[in-house]
From Swiss-Prot:
Transmembrane segments: none
Protein name: Serine/threonine-protein kinase ULK4
Biological classification of the source: Eukaryota, Metazoa, Chordata, Craniata, Vertebrata
Enzyme's top EC category: transferase
Highest rank taxon of the organism: Eukaryota
Enzyme Commission numbers on file: 2.7.11.1
Family to which this protein belongs: Belongs to the protein kinase superfamily. Ser/Thr protein kinase family. APG1/unc-51/ULK1 subfamily.
Keyword Plastid: no
Single GO MF annotation: ATP binding
Repeat positions for HEAT: 842-880, 926-964, 1025-1063, 1151-1189, 1213-1253
Amino acid sequence: MENFILYEEIGRGSKTVVYKGRRKGTINFVAILCTDKCKRPEITNWVRLTREIKHKNIVTFHEWYETSNHLWLVVELCTGGSLKTVIAQDENLPEDVVREFGIDLISGLHHLHKLGILFCDISPRKILLEGPGTLKFSNFCLAKVEGENLEEFFALVAAEEGGGDNGENVLKKSMKSRVKGSPVYTAPEVVRGADFSISSDLWSLGCLLYEMFSGKPPFFSESISELTEKILCEDPLPPIPKDSSRPKASSDFINLLDGLLQRDPQKRLTWTRLLQHSFWKKAFAGADQESSVEDLSLSRNTMECSGPQDSKELLQNSQSRQAKGHKSGQPLGHSFRLENPTEFRPKSTLEGQLNESMFLLSSRPTPRTSTAVEVSPGEDMTHCSPQKTSPLTKITSGHLSQQDLESQMRELIYTDSDLVVTPIIDNPKIMKQPPVKFDAKILHLPTYSVDKLLFLKDQDWNDFLQQVCSQIDSTEKSMGASRAKLNLLCYLCVVAGHQEVATRLLHSPLFQLLIQHLRIAPNWDIRAKVAHVIGLLASHTAELQENTPVVEAIVLLTELIRENFRNSKLKQCLLPTLGELIYLVATQEEKKKNPRECWAVPLAAYTVLMRCLREGEERVVNHMAAKIIENVCTTFSAQSQGFITGEIGPILWYLFRHSTADSLRITAVSALCRITRHSPTAFQNVIEKVGLNSVINSLASAICKVQQYMLTLFAAMLSCGIHLQRLIQEKGFVSTIIRLLDSPSTCIRAKAFLVLLYILIYNREMLLLSCQARLVMYIERDSRKTTPGKEQQSGNEYLSKCLDLLICHIVQELPRILGDILNSLANVSGRKHPSTVQVKQLKLCLPLMPVVLHLVTSQVFRPQVVTEEFLFSYGTILSHIKSVDSGETNIDGAIGLTASEEFIKITLSAFEAIIQYPILLKDYRSTVVDYILPPLVSLVQSQNVEWRLFSLRLLSETTSLLVNQEFGDGKEKASVDSDSNLLALIRDVLLPQYEHILLEPDPVPAYALKLLVAMTEHNPTFTRLVEESKLIPLIFEVTLEHQESILGNTMQSVIALLSNLVACKDSNMELLYEQGLVSHICNLLTETATLCLDVDNKNNNEMAAPLLFSLLDILHSMLTYTSGIVRLALQAQKSGSGEDPQAAEDLLLLNRPLTDLISLLIPLLPNEDPEIFDVSSKCLSILVQLYGGENPDSLSPENVEIFAHLLTSKEDPKEQKLLLRILRRMITSNEKHLESLKNAGSLLRALERLAPGSGSFADSAVAPLALEILQAVGH
């Protein structure tokens, strides 16, 4: 089995979360639905219908898994959101778009119907868009094979489910209500009670087309009864787009909608007529013309189901179809059946139970998508929209006092998901009950449906009620009479599942009659069924009137349970009803906000329930009692206070630890969690009885809900200060909490952040342990997943609130940490032997320095913690480090040599992290120059080689960044001041040390030279400082020592520095020449050019190219300087000013070795880099102007070929003219070169092409030059 990586959450429902995911080891992205196990029937249905369907308009199923807590469905990822979102955003769509979308819908639906599948619940939220705009049917939870009973299918799957289901919600409605979809798109015949059909799907399709065009469905009302009446009785209005500027609907479209929205299914469009409709403009011309309702429908004989046995036949394994080689296009209804649901399971039952960790939550940021994949019927997903603002730039504004912080934290301890209430009665997690059925034939009164009962007139209702009471009150003289009464009670069980009906029955005389029969009925079967009816009425009623005798029923039930306490079966019948009644009273009292004497629950009821929790009872009884406590303690009422005793916590904990059924364990810890909400001592009693370690170990549970409730309990404990000192000192506890940050559950991660915040508030030292356990990484990951705004999902919103508070606290804590470090260092400043108290303070504070490093390297914290105050404090710490390094202060004896060195290293590393973001230096330039750079400069003199190198590297990189920054908005003056301070600092403190620094082993000279490069590049004054500091000889000495590794960092810095010095107008060139500039440049240029011309080593070519360009730049500056001096001397000679030309002659003599470079410069001319050609040709031109053709190899055969190639390939007249002038100067100054040219056939031909009269289009300035050269050689 393969694991999956989960990225961001892209959809959410009440019981389902949808993630964008990726199969580990591949680049295939998928949608992964994580759903509670209570949705097993729906998910199983989806899988059995779609697992072999491959169609462009149907979301592809890949595979499914079952883990300890959830079902996981892996399907095709659709990145365009849902059709519901599109309609909501655009309000209405143009008719052309409706046609395009409609073609996709019809293609997909037609394919499903050909397979014998009815979608049954077509709505915009179940239609997804792929990136290019293709519509796809998704969420087949309520789809079915034509003719089957989906309710029975669900019941069969649910019956096969084991007791270890860990989903958080138990079904609140019956199977019948569970298989109902959205009524807005339901066909009239289905509303009346008929089964779904092809025709009803086509009605829904018509509603969808109508809504796309007009922006609203054809029938809509907030009231279900009003909506039903509209669907059954009214005709839809013609569709009108919301945007009045858009064209009205065409006659073809109106005709199409009229055909699809016929109330009589016999008159509705069939597939044949639909595909041939003119609205589609022959888009389905190639479709199967035999497609008709009759062809598509499956025989009722084949699919008929009359009872549970037939329902099992409907569940037949689709592998049989594969074995028989089923033909494409043939109705496949029978192929979706399962003979035995255990043969059709997600991956886990065959391979052993899987752990939730197979779905790993990614910590890598990914762009959000707006994919929407919805699951449960009736569930509205909250879809993520693309991020508009990055949460990483979110700053927690303002200072939050600890009182305000803890106040906000207390509000976050309990969430809605901690207080979910599920039914006590008919709860399949507690005990699976057979479906309640009644026989209408022996029911001696009208068999009204729930919908019919809702619309009965008062007189009819009273008549109905009288008949019911009469039959219940009748004596049971025979077995038949008893069966009839039981049948009637079964009927009441069915209708009591509806809220309005239950409310009316509870407040009718029937309720008093039921209590009476519960007390006196001789038949215990009837008593049990009466109790069941009472429980269902209590569970579903919406209001409770004060005169309703619920307390009488509670007292009676308590007495019956107490009198028959050894009868476990009887307790199992009566306890759920007792619990529902107490919970009903508690909720009503909470609504009324003050206790009612008439609703006071007797103490005996609490006593009975506590007895039912004890060891030795059957687990079902334990579970029922725990569920009652869980529900009642969700409320703030007098009833919940009755359960708060000294023994309740340990009893529930015993159930949690010793039960084998996960559902009971979850209920027990959930009940404990809710009791602790009223009285934290309940959990305190648990810790004192079983020990803190045992309780902490329960956080490692594989059940997500248990982890969630345990985190809630610990947060509640910490908020009250109970066991505070023990918990905040327990490193194992902190490590366990941080491990929970890997959970795929948003709620668990949020609560883990909240618990950590409580710990960090009271124990700052745990921040270091948390950072070492990757807390900052977890914060960054979840910060990417939380975006501010209304569109934020509830789970992410909760996570965002917890994260914001944690980030706010850590940001506010950092200055305190730095303050403590500064105080501890200030107290020992200048002392060789710190006192015991000072040693203790150092040991406590200095180890927290890594926290600073963790925060400044975080993109979440860095913008918030790096402030002017922070940099000032940091600079002060560096000053203390300087004192420690120089020996003025001794902390080695206090904390140890290793700890001292680690402290210094981390401090320097923190600034290294800051300078990776130059904007921070720009904002606080003066603070950096005035408070951080001086101690860094002092550390360059350190005796410790590591600190000397580290500080020099930081100084070099910081200086480079500072001098490269540009300032505006009135900051120029501050910039000038800081520049002068920086210059003075380097001049007075650093440059005097360079004599030793430059002669140290690598890489020290490289960083030292890099600083000089940055300063000389942007500050001409600094060039004079370099010369005055007598660094020039040292620079050339470094050159000699490192010339063997010319591509190394040191030589690159040397060449860059020489380039700056030579290019500076104020530079003392005579000093450079005296120190051997010419010979050094000749050597360096020769070696670098050789590397560039080596065709066999491309790596060296690429590395040497920038270096070569710098050296050529230096050469060009030298030659330009020389030619300028020579020109001035010639001008003086012509004018007869009498100036001595000796200086110019000496300079020419000094530069004469540069003529050896001519034979290197010519091969560089064909270089692919135009800049190298440009500077090489300029250098060559000046050299031949100054020295003519002195180099004997200037026009060697190889060089002649290069000139010939260049004159042929270069098209720019300026470049041609420059090359020709170089040639002319060579041949006119050296007879040997003239002779060489006479024999150069290729070069002569190139010159002939450029000469006048050759038929070429040579430039007017180029042609005479070419002709002049040809004439000189006799052509």
